[in-house]
Amino acid sequence: MKKIILISIFILISALSAQANEIKRIFVGNESAKISIIAFESLTCSYCAKFHQDVYPLLKKEFLDTGLAKIEFRHFPLDIAAFNASKVAQCTNDGNLEILESLYANQQKWVKGSSIEEANINLQKFLSKEGFNIDFESCINNKQIE
């Protein structure tokens, strides 16, 4: 019985790992760099926005552009607005930082609203105004990227 349970757990973990590997990560730098940085971020976090504004350019110049390090950005939403924004960012992810940089640089323009519906409308309007061609509802309702 224990053997069956262990095998079942192993299969489940393998399946989850395979599914996680299918998600395209937002990655910058030399893939073979010895230094790997994984940044867990929330798109509504003001400190994360400050990192992208002040720290990331220096990190990129000194470590990423020189091939010394690589960085992977992972979503760690702290609220429902960040969760939906991260779903949209992941849904449209082409592996670069364009949408993340825009969301962080303009955080105060879209992180508004007294309800999730209002926050979603603000996010959708912002992305459209910025020229991101996104099927917003499809991304928000995509269960595979949750």
Label for each model-derived stretch:
Residues 1-79, 83, 125, 145-146:
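Extracytoplasmic thiol/disulfide redox context detector
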